[in-house]
A protein has these predicted regions:
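Short cysteine-rich clusters marking metal-coordination/redox-active sites
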Residues: 1-3, 26-27
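Short Cys/His-rich "knuckle" micro-motifs
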Residues: 5-12, 36-39
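Short linker/helix segments within small regulatory modules
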Residues: 12-22
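Short metal-binding segments enriched for Cys and/or His
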Residues: 26-44
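Conserved phosphate/pyrophosphate-binding and hydrolysis machinery centered on Walker-type P-loop NTPases
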Residues: 54-55, 76-79, 93-101, 125-129
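Amphipathic alpha-helical segments that form the core helices of the histone-fold
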Residues: 80-94, 104-110
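Long C-terminal interaction/binding lobes of large macromolecular proteins
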Residues: 102, 108-112, 118, 123-148
């Protein structure tokens, strides 16, 4: 495809909650392809537990969530939905910096209504569980929330 400008738009639709536009295009020779227009988000700094700062990395968060919850989520799409929801919540704060603790809390909020085992697994990594009592405490907390 030499020049995207020669193509015509066949279909347009909003995706990612209005944060992007997906366009189906057709080249003069009849070939079809898809383009995406995304809103560029401002840089977001993460303040780590050590006090150091680094840029928010969606891929890093996705890998951390996938690793910690194992196979307890139904699909990669479910992990992606969690990461998107967390990212949206972070940008909705309107701050240029966010703590790693806030990110972990947002992930726990998303996992809480998706999969209880994934929630406990992530909590054990995020909150650095060291004893069985740590597990018992989080399980009792989740049970009280579920019953109440």
């Amino acid at each position: 495809m030499k020049n995207i400008g020669d193509s015509r738009v066949v279909e347009s639709r909003e995706v990612s909650g209005g944060m992007a536009i997906r366009r189906r295009r057709e080249a003069p020779d009849g070939r079809r392809f898809t383009t995406y227009e995304r809103i560029e988000k401002p840089n977001l700094a993460v303040i780590k537990r050590s006090g150091t700062r680094e840029l928010f990395d969606r891929t890093k968060l996705s890998l951390a969530v996938s690793r910690s919850v194992g196979k307890f989520l139904k699909s990669d799409e479910e992990v992606e939905a969690i990461i998107s929801a967390v990212e949206d919540a972070l940008y909705a704060l309107g701050d240029s910096e966010v703590s790693s603790r806030q990110i972990g809390e947002f992930v726990l909020d998303e996992l809480a209504h998706r999969n209880e085992v994934a929630y406990v697994r992530f909590a054990s990594v995020f909150q650095k569980f060291e004893t069985l009592d740590d597990f018992v405490q989080i399980l009792e907390k989740r049970k009280a929330i579920k019953e109440g």
